[in-house]
Swiss-Prot record:
Residues 191-193 form a propeptide. This is Rho-related GTP-binding protein RhoA-D. Its main location: membrane. Pfam families: Ras (PF00071). GO terms for cellular component: cytosol; plasma membrane. The lineage of its organism: Eukaryota, Metazoa, Chordata, Craniata, Vertebrata. InterPro entries: P-loop_NTPase (IPR027417), Small_GTP-bd (IPR005225), Small_GTPase (IPR001806), Small_GTPase_Rho (IPR003578). It is found in: Cell membrane. NCBIfam families: small_GTP. One of its GO terms (biological process) is cell migration. The gene is rhoad.
Length: 193
């Protein structure tokens, strides 16, 4: 039986951990060096609920310089991973300010999984000290859950690509969300207007 094909697009602020999450899931290795993404695609096979799914993983650039290029990733998307970083309250603030309006404009009716990346840094002393200097603290799990409700996300999960904690669960939830959509509506993929 041929695998079902689904397209996943990951969005979020620059340096919030999008590429590491995709690479750890698809290649099982953590990249130690940060290289800003322009456009990358990966393919990963995943089995959920006895279904074989070939997941096309579309990485995007979070930096503002790419705001006009990013929409080219959106057509025919089945699920969105919308990411912020637990060590960056500002990246969580950009979820309703920037990412939700953009995604809902180009991908109406496409399920969104809100993902808190870098959860290993929540209790990291160096991270906490740096945030205190800016009168901030790491994002709490309940703040992530509240945001997921606020943007009507399909679900909320936290993970650490570095420790691999929660990575598989993110993609299992995303795959389930992508599979569910098709039952309701035959063709509700992204539109480019």
């Amino acid at each position: 039986m041929a695998a079902i094909r689904k397209k996943l697009v990951i969005v979020g602020d620059g340096a919030c951990g999008k590429t590491c999450l995709l690479i750890v899931f698809s290649k099982d290795q953590f990249p130690e060096v940060y290289v800003p993404t322009v456009f990358e695609n990966y393919i990963a096979d995943i089995e959920v609920d006895s279904k074989q799914v070939e997941l096309a993983l579309w990485d995007t650039a979070g930096q503002e310089d790419y705001d006009r290029l990013r929409p080219l990733s959106y057509p025919d998307t089945d699920v969105i991973l919308m990411c912020f970083s637990v060590d960056s309250p500002d990246s969580l603030e950009n979820i309703p300010e920037k990412w939700t309006p953009e995604v809902k404009h180009f991908c109406p009716n496409v399920p969104i999984i809100l993902v808190g990346n870098k959860k290993d840094l929540r209790n990291d002393e160096h991270t906490r000290r740096e945030l205190i200097k800016m009168k901030q603290e790491p994002v709490k799990p309940e703040e992530g859950r509240d945001m997921a409700n606020r943007i009507s996300a399909f679900g909320y999960l936290e993970c650490s690509a570095k420790t691999k904690d929660g990575v598989r669960e993110v993609f299992e939830m995303a795959t389930r969300a992508a599979l569910q959509v098709r039952k309701r509506k035959k063709r509700s993929g992204c539109l480019l207007l």
